[in-house]
Amino acid sequence: MNYINLPTVLPGSPSKTRGQIQVILGPMFSGKSTELMRRVRRFQIAQNKCLVIKYAKDTRYSSSFSTHDRNTMDALPACLLRDVAQEALGAAVIGIDEGQFFPDIVEFCEVMANAGKTVIVAALDGTFQRKAFGSILNLVPLAESVVKLTAVCMECFREAAYTKRLGLEKEVEVIGGADKYHSVCRVCYFKKSSVQPAGPDNKENCPVLGQPGEASAVRKLFAPQQVLQHNSTN
């Protein structure tokens, strides 16, 4: 029987590993970090060299990368991703937690993916004001895979797509857990929290009305009924 000797690298096959960008988005408490950890561990089991990068200003769990339920994984802290570029080039798989905090997230991920790395990013897609968080959404058109997770509303237990701040801080970057934030649904997002002041100064969680007179018009609808009840009692 004659055997055919095939070349080790077939013609037309890539000469190096193809890189890719995977993005995991969602509100707080939606399991983004847990999903990032799960994906990285799959690559570790397959004997790939992995590096996880965490935001250095988040010191709640020391130097480890951690989920809210305290599952941990070794991580390299950084404030700018370019500061850990050399370490990243030595890994096949790069996981980035809290990607919304890194100002150079888009450039870093594109460079690493073009260098053949698998880059997995977990990040908030929106701020507590439901606005784009930093430049993270600019990563979406560059990514091969994008997933948006939902949480459970911590006020009514329905599906939650938003993050609601409980305190009065105005800064976008305020690190905290359930003591500072709730994952909420659309209805509960607009409900006033007991720690939030009512009035015109609290614009973060206020719905936008179609016409300026809508709010007063609603109150007028109930005026005749209130007058009738008052007359009947007299």
Swiss-Prot record:
<dbReference type="GO" id="GO:0046105">
    <property type="term" value="P:thymidine biosynthetic process"/>
</dbReference>
<feature type="modified residue" description="Phosphoserine">
    <location>
        <position position="13"/>
    </location>
</feature>
<dbReference type="GO" id="GO:0042802">
    <property type="term" value="F:identical protein binding"/>
</dbReference>
<keyword id="KW-0808">Transferase</keyword>
<keyword id="KW-0963">Cytoplasm</keyword>
<dbReference type="GO" id="GO:0008270">
    <property type="term" value="F:zinc ion binding"/>
</dbReference>
<dbReference type="InterPro" id="IPR027417">
    <property type="entry name" value="P-loop_NTPase"/>
</dbReference>
<feature type="binding site">
    <location>
        <begin position="172"/>
        <end position="176"/>
    </location>
    <ligand>
        <name>substrate</name>
    </ligand>
</feature>
<feature type="binding site">
    <location>
        <position position="181"/>
    </location>
    <ligand>
        <name>substrate</name>
    </ligand>
</feature>
<dbReference type="Pfam" id="PF00265">
    <property type="entry name" value="TK"/>
</dbReference>
<feature type="binding site">
    <location>
        <begin position="58"/>
        <end position="60"/>
    </location>
    <ligand>
        <name>ATP</name>
    </ligand>
</feature>
<feature type="binding site">
    <location>
        <position position="128"/>
    </location>
    <ligand>
        <name>substrate</name>
    </ligand>
</feature>
<keyword id="KW-0862">Zinc</keyword>
<dbReference type="GO" id="GO:0046104">
    <property type="term" value="P:thymidine metabolic process"/>
</dbReference>
<dbReference type="GO" id="GO:0004797">
    <property type="term" value="F:thymidine kinase activity"/>
</dbReference>
<feature type="binding site">
    <location>
        <begin position="26"/>
        <end position="33"/>
    </location>
    <ligand>
        <name>ATP</name>
    </ligand>
</feature>
<keyword id="KW-0067">ATP-binding</keyword>
<keyword id="KW-0479">Metal-binding</keyword>
<feature type="active site" description="Proton acceptor">
    <location>
        <position position="98"/>
    </location>
</feature>
<feature type="binding site">
    <location>
        <position position="153"/>
    </location>
    <ligand>
        <name>Zn(2+)</name>
    </ligand>
</feature>
<dbReference type="GO" id="GO:1904860">
    <property type="term" value="P:DNA synthesis involved in mitotic DNA replication"/>
</dbReference>
<dbReference type="GO" id="GO:0005524">
    <property type="term" value="F:ATP binding"/>
</dbReference>
<dbReference type="GO" id="GO:0005634">
    <property type="term" value="C:nucleus"/>
</dbReference>
<keyword id="KW-0237">DNA synthesis</keyword>
<feature type="binding site">
    <location>
        <position position="188"/>
    </location>
    <ligand>
        <name>Zn(2+)</name>
    </ligand>
</feature>
<feature type="binding site">
    <location>
        <begin position="97"/>
        <end position="100"/>
    </location>
    <ligand>
        <name>ATP</name>
    </ligand>
</feature>
<feature type="binding site">
    <location>
        <position position="185"/>
    </location>
    <ligand>
        <name>Zn(2+)</name>
    </ligand>
</feature>
<protein>
    <recommendedName>
        <fullName>Thymidine kinase, cytosolic</fullName>
        <ecNumber>2.7.1.21</ecNumber>
    </recommendedName>
</protein>
<keyword id="KW-0418">Kinase</keyword>
<feature type="binding site">
    <location>
        <position position="156"/>
    </location>
    <ligand>
        <name>Zn(2+)</name>
    </ligand>
</feature>
<dbReference type="InterPro" id="IPR001267">
    <property type="entry name" value="Thymidine_kinase"/>
</dbReference>
<feature type="short sequence motif" description="KEN box">
    <location>
        <begin position="203"/>
        <end position="205"/>
    </location>
</feature>
<keyword id="KW-0597">Phosphoprotein</keyword>
<dbReference type="GO" id="GO:0005737">
    <property type="term" value="C:cytoplasm"/>
</dbReference>
<dbReference type="InterPro" id="IPR020633">
    <property type="entry name" value="Thymidine_kinase_CS"/>
</dbReference>
<comment type="similarity">
    <text>Belongs to the thymidine kinase family.</text>
</comment>
<dbReference type="GO" id="GO:0051289">
    <property type="term" value="P:protein homotetramerization"/>
</dbReference>
<comment type="function">
    <text>Cell-cycle-regulated enzyme of importance in nucleotide metabolism. Catalyzes the first enzymatic step in the salvage pathway converting thymidine into thymidine monophosphate. Transcriptional regulation limits expression to the S phase of the cell cycle and transient expression coincides with the oscillation in the intracellular dTTP concentration.</text>
</comment>
<keyword id="KW-0832">Ubl conjugation</keyword>
<keyword id="KW-0547">Nucleotide-binding</keyword>
<comment type="subunit">
    <text>Homotetramer. Tetramerization from dimerization is induced by ATP and increases catalytic efficiency due to a high affinity for thymidine. Tetramerization is inhibited by phosphorylation at Ser-13. Interacts (via the KEN box) with FZR1.</text>
</comment>
